Regions:
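Conserved catalytic core of the tyrosine transesterase superfamily
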Residues: 1-300
Length: 300
């Protein structure tokens, strides 16, 4: 790899984490993309100050030859544009070659949505298991209920602390992308599941002072992978097919809009920086309406 670019990439990543407050996963993604460029530039660039648009385009073309999806190309080029903009602002580049680096637009697929009937079957199944009193089953029911009730991300539910919960107002304080905090409400089924979990949470504890809300069998904060596996297993037999926690997020948003929720309220609930990101769910709702019309109307 190009040693100078690697060094700058690490400095850039540190800035993203400390000054911009990006999450570890986001920083890791940016760093990976810049290191990809560093590998390409090795032997092609003597001094970093000579980096130009031609080299960036050549790198992006090489990435495309790996049969990368448009969404991957879009993400990688966005990472490099951020990197070169930072280098320019730091005086490391006289001009910003990444400013004119264009990438194919990521094709947007309509997100999967789990049918309400399928969800109700899962909720009933989880409630039956939780009624055994087994702490893991009680916890798992709460996880699924809260993910659907709030539409929060898997990283956000795993990051919750006990003090994140306000039972008096039925809300949770969530730390989202960019360390932005938002308040998200939840309904009575999730509240019931939460209270049942809080009653057995102490059985997971191995030491005092643990602040994490969701705990594993060792008394530590439950990891993202464990939640992903739980949700994936529960959704595996539904018509939706292979899916994970993000599908529950999509489903919650779509069901809210189906029920007449305001688009901006849903944007705030999900923690989207852009309204355009939330608008994808309006397309899902229209598609569902069209499909329902086609199946139900005698002259469809």
């Amino acid at each position: 790899m190009h040693a100078e670019v690697v060094s700058l990439a690490n400095r850039f990543a540190e800035q993203l984490a400390t000054l911009r407050g990006y999450s570890p996963n986001t920083v890791k993604s940016y760093l990976s993309d810049v290191l990809d460029l560093a590998g390409f530039l090795d032997g092609k660039l003597s001094e970093f100050k000579d980096l130009d648009l031609g080299l960036l385009r050549e790198w992006l073309w090489q990435v495309s030859q790996r049969e990368a999806a448009n969404s991957t190309l879009a993400r990688k080029s966005a990472s490099i544009r951020s990197f070169t903009a930072w280098c320019h602002s730091e005086g490391l580049l006289e001009a910003d070659p990444g400013q004119r680096l264009k990438s194919p637009k990521a094709k947007r697929h309509l997100p999967k949505v789990v049918a309400k009937d399928s969800l109700n079957e899962i909720f009933d199944h989880l409630k039956t298991l939780a009624e055994t009193g087994e702490p893991v089953m009680v916890r798992n029911r709460f996880i699924f209920e809260l993910l659907y009730a709030t539409g929060i991300r898997v990283s956000e539910i795993c990051g919750l602390d006990v003090l994140s919960i306000d039972l008096g107002r039925n809300v949770i304080r969530v730390i989202g992308k960019g360390s932005k905090e938002r308040v998200v409400p939840f309904g009575l089924p999730a509240r019931d599941a939460l209270q049942e979990y809080l009653a057995v949470r102490e059985k997971f504890l191995t030491e005092p002072g643990q602040s994490a809300l969701l705990l594993n069998s060792k008394g530590k904060r439950l990891g993202v992978r464990a939640v992903y596996q739980l949700v994936a297993e529960l959704l595996a037999d539904t018509p939706t097919g292979a899916a994970g926690p993000h599908t529950l997020r999509h489903t919650a948003a779509t069901h809210l809009l189906d029920g007449g929720a305001d688009l901006r309220a849903v944007q705030e609930l999900l923690g989207h920086a852009s309204l355009g990101t939330t608008q994808i769910y309006t397309h899902v709702s229209v598609e569902r309406l069209r499909e329902g019309y086609k199946n139900a109307h005698p002259r469809a």
